[in-house]
UniProtKB/Swiss-Prot annotation:
Binding site for NAD(+): 319-333, 411, 554
Family: Belongs to the HIBADH-related family. NP60 subfamily.
Subcellular location: Chromosome
Modified positions (Phosphoserine) in chain numbering: 8, 10, 224, 228, 243
SMART domains according to UniProt: PWWP
Lineage, opening ranks: Eukaryota, Metazoa, Ecdysozoa, Arthropoda, Hexapoda
Major localisation: nucleus
Annotated protein name in UniProt: Cytokine-like nuclear factor N-PAC
Subunit structure, as described in the record: Binds to mononucleosomes. Interacts with male-specific lethal (MSL) histone acetyltransferase complex at least composed of mof, msl-1, msl-2 and msl-3.
Stretches assigned to the PWWP domain: 22-81
Biased composition (Polar residues): 176-188, 204-217, 224-233
Organism, scientific name: Drosophila melanogaster (Fruit fly)
InterPro entries cross-referenced by the UniProt entry: 6-PGluconate_DH-like_C_sf, 6PGD_dom2, 6PGDH_NADP-bd, GLYR1_PWWP, HIBADH-like_NADP-bd, HIBADH-related_NP60_sf, NAD(P)-bd_dom_sf, PWWP_dom
């Protein structure tokens, strides 16, 4: 560091003002803190984006190893008569650690220098000035030179150190590159001392605000900057204009006729990224929505729970319409326990593994009804369930079901169940609604809950099937009762999931470990296997579908329609339904219902 004229500092003492350079060890005073050991460094890119006062230096603090802008009147050299006094001002552990850290740096600077270099990167003080020119409409062709200069140099990097106050000299270090890399070539140092012009509106300030993208305007700016090196008088851009002066001086000092400068593209992009608003960062950092993994049925796997049950298969033939997530798992267990099964699915390829396992495949639902004694249906929504019964080649195309049983396992509303039951009875059939409550994993382990209503004789005939796929089975009486109970249970599940997702999203904003929250939750009386499982999925970001989010939102919609008919107010369920609808719009329709966490988090 070099000395300059005497100035009066904040303490009233008269001392020599120092012009600091990178790697100068100093004492720095921040508001609210005692003087702290630090080092002058080149500012990192994220610090460049912050507004700062004039006459500030970027300081690296030992101990905490972070960066901040400090005014020059709050900086003193580390070595001096004041060192002993300042070292005794504070004795907390953090201060002692900082003193130890700087002493280690004096002995061996390698570790700290490496950390500072990683944070700050290669010094390029022209980056911000060039960025401003691009922002103000300067043509990119005038920023990035495409041809080499007359003497083979690729550009000039000017490093300005010192105070921009009036009357102070400016030390300009000009690294003239005679090869391809300005970092490795020797530096030629030039001293340029001069007085600043008064802070009045200059020609440069006017030309910077001129027409965007015009080559003529760009030429005016360069000419004006050469005529008036003080640059614009705007206080907020004073610091940036100092870098602009240095670039102009460097161009004049170099032997290149064009003086074109290269802009570090990566540095510019990083500077732009540092200026993004927090909401923009959250939006851009949102995870990419990927398709959930395709669910492949492993026909060779066997559930230990199912193997322990003493199941005697019925001699009747069971038809199954729909081989979706739940349907395929149920059919697999029925085949494994020795039941005779006939299957149909809209996508015929899904039937192939079951055909290889011994099931008979039919072309239409009507063909399945002809070949089976009891027909199960498990599709995704009420409309699909109705289409299979009343549609073309549907169940009722036979006209006479000959006392066959039809079991509706799709999640439907009570009115739809009553309509299907009425149609089956009119065609001389028997009807049972058997709502299944549980996840795909519970279905694979035979741990579902069956809620049945309708014809009691059908319920008895399906005893072996229900024992295969469920741990508990309930007969609830008339048609519609089972649908109501199932939708009520789904309401509890949906509201609980949204509450869990919002709570974990809040913990994530506090930077609290989600796994810690779940571990503590497991010790409370609120715990439940379902919430624990969903919480772990949210913490891991594992949204492979056990119960698709679209199915959960469908159930909530059915609940609200059912409540509307009764004039029953359900405000919390309504909000929960909107949350799931929004999550569907984000692209998580086919993911697990725990993906609602993504919506709460972002």
């Amino acid at each position: 560091m070099s000395k300059n004229k005497k100035l009066s500092l904040s303490g009233g003492d008269t001392t020599e003002k120092f012009i600091y350079k990178p790697k100068d060890l100093i004492w720095a005073k921040m508001k609210g803190f005692t003087p702290w050991p630090g080092m002058i460094v080149d500012p990192p890119l994220d610090l460049l984006s912050q507004q700062r006062r004039a006459n500030t230096k970027c300081v690296f603090f030992f101990g905490s190893r972070n960066f901040a802008w400090i005014e020059e009147n709050n900086i003193k050299p580390f070595e001096g008569p004041w060192k002993e006094e300042l070292a005794k001002v504070s004795k907390p552990a953090a201060f002692r650690h900082a003193m130890t850290d700087i002493e280690k740096y004096i002995d061996d600077p390698a570790e700290v220098d490496e950390q500072v270099n990683k944070s700050c990167g290669a010094p390029n003080h022209a980056t911000e000035a060039d960025f401003d020119k691009i922002r103000d409409g300067l043509d990119s062709e005038e920023i990035v030179g495409e041809e080499a200069t007359a003497d083979g140099n690729n550009g000039v990097v000017a490093h300005v150190v010192g105070s921009p106050d009036e009357g102070d000299g400016l030390d300009v270090e000009i690294n003239a590159d005679s090869s391809a890399s300005p970092v490795t070539s020797p530096a030629v140092t030039t001293k340029a001392a001069g007085k600043r012009t008064p802070k009045a509106k200059s020609v440069a300030a006017t030309s910077v605000k001129s027409t965007k993208g015009s080559a003529k305007s760009a030429q005016k700016r360069r000419t004006s900057a050469q005529q008036s090196p003080s640059g614009p008088s705007n206080a907020k851009r004073g610091k940036r204009d100092v870098s602009g002066e240095a670039l102009q001086d460097a161009d004049e000092a170099s032997s290149t006729p064009t003086g074109r400068r290269r802009v570090e593209t990566d540095a510019l992009l990083a500077s732009i990224a540092a200026k993004r608003a927090p909401n923009a960062i959250a939006l851009l950092d949102r995870p990419v929505v990927t398709r959930p993994e395709a669910q492949v049925i492993d026909m060779s796997s066997r559930s230990n729970t199912l193997a322990d049950r003493d199941i005697v298969p019925s001699e009747q033939t069971f038809g199954f319409l729909g081989l979706g997530m739940m349907g395929s798992t149920i059919v697999k267990d029925l085949i494994y326990t020795g039941h005779k099964v006939v299957v149909w699915n809209r996508t015929i390829d899904k039937c192939q593994p079951f055909a290889e396992a011994g099931a008979e495949v039919k072309d239409t639902p009507m063909d399945v009804v002809e070949a089976a004694d009891v027909i199960f249906c498990c599709v995704s929504d009420p409309k699909g369930a109705k289409d299979l019964v009343f549609g073309n080649c549907g169940v009722l195309q036979l006209k006479d079901l000959n006392n066959k049983a039809y079991v509706e396992m799709s999640t439907i509303d009570p009115d739809t169940s009553l309509d299907i039951g009425e149609g089956i009875k009119q065609c001389n059939g028997r009807y049972l609604e058997a709502q299944i409550h549980g996840s795909r994993q519970e279905a694979a382990e035979g741990m579902l809950i069956i809620l049945a209503g309708g014809d009691r004789s059908v319920f008895e005939e399906c005893h072996s099937c229900f024992k295969t796929i469920a741990k508990n089975t309930f007969f609830l009486g008339n048609i519609g009762n089972a649908c109501k109970v199932n939708l009520i249970l789904q309401t509890i599940l949906g509201v609980s999931l949204v509450g869990l997702a919002e709570a974990l999203a809040l913990a994530d904003r506090f930077s609290i470990s989600l796994n810690d929250i779940i571990d503590i939750f497991d010790l409370t009386s609120m715990k439940s296997p379902m919430l624990l499982a969903k919480g772990k999925e949210m913490a891991k970001g594992d949204f492979n579908p056990q119960q698709p989010l679209s199915h959960m939102q469908r159930d909530l919609r059915l609940v609200l329609n059912m409540a509307e008919n009764l004039d029953q107010s359900m405000p919390v369920t309504s909000i929960t339904n909107e949350v799931f609808k929004h999550t569907k719009r984000l692209g998580y329709s086919e993911h697990d219902s725990s993906a609602v966490f993504v919506r709460s988090r972002f």
